[in-house]
Amino acid sequence: MLDVSREDIATGSLPRVLLLLAVPLVAQNLALVAQQVVDLFWVGRLGGDAVAAVGLSTVVIGLAMVPVLVFAVGSQVLTAQRVGAGAVERARRVPVNAAGAAVVVTSVVGVGLVVLPPTVGGLFDPSAAVADMAVAYLSAYSLALVATGASDALESGFTGWGDTRAAFLVNASAIAVNVVLDPLLILGYWVFPEWGVAGAAVATAVGYAVGALLALALAVRGRGDFRLTRASVTPDLPTVREVLGVGLPIAGQNAGRQVARLLVVAVVSIVAGAPGLAAYHIGSQVASVAFVPAQGLGQAATSVVG
């Protein structure tokens, strides 16, 4: 029912195509919000300081995720453009090359998340307990950053191809694994270690690693015209440059928003301390639900327009 062919995108009814493409994307964005709420629930079992630490970490991660956005947006837009131009073999090269470049760049950024958190935490003047947990969360999240970079670039390739159902499947699988692992790794249920807030970050890393592997498996197996060939997995620096050319301007806009969030959180932390940070984080997670439909339609429009 939600199948959309290349011919539908090029010549079909625009409202119908947008709706069919947007439904899985809205569903996956809702699932992502639900996952964040579940994270919040289990971290909340550790106390208000833990919620404040994750809230403090989230804005730092928002900046660290800017390179992920570069390759995800570039992968989606460039794939859509090449598919629309009928350059199917060239389109196949985009997601894999974007994912490979994302892994390289996010690995470097991930090292920064391990090295810099103590310095960054001091800028917000949190309590010692909040700062220590934020450092633990950010250090563990460095693994998630690499997995997310690969998963999002591949997933965005499916979206750019018009196969939003595959993108939903990849994202939903990552979220499901994350949700299952959250209580096990945060609170140490069954045979799992109790890692506290770091467990939430590790659960995210494992979830998105599963998502990346599933996306790769779907691409190897092939879905419609999107399948990996020997030519498509060959490193292609001109394609990577094109991905950067498309993704950098949008990522730059996002970086500006993340810096603004960083300043807001700094003020909240200095003025209201851990309780204020926790309240801000809870409120921002709940408020994110309002943006889900617009995000889904925006992603669908990007796939159509290219």
Could you tell me what each predicted segment is?
Residues 16-76, 248-270:
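Signature of the first transmembrane helix
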Residues 21-29, 62, 102, 141, ...:
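Residue-level signature of transmembrane alpha-helical cores of multipass secondary-active transporters
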Residues 51-114, 148-162, 167, 277-306:
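Small-residue-rich hydrophobic transmembrane alpha-helices
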Residues 34-52, 121-128, 186-188, 192-195, ...:
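Helix-terminus/linker motif at the lipid-water interface of multi-pass membrane proteins
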Residues 27, 42-43, 54, 79-84, ...:
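Hydrophobic/aromatic residues within transmembrane alpha-helices of membrane transport systems
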Residues 113, 169-195, 210-218:
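Alpha-helical transmembrane segments of multi-pass membrane transporters
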Residues 1-22, 79-144, 194-248, 305:
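Short alpha-helical transmembrane segments in multi-pass integral membrane proteins
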Residues 102, 156-184, 198-205:
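Alpha-helical transmembrane segments of multi-pass membrane transporters/permeases
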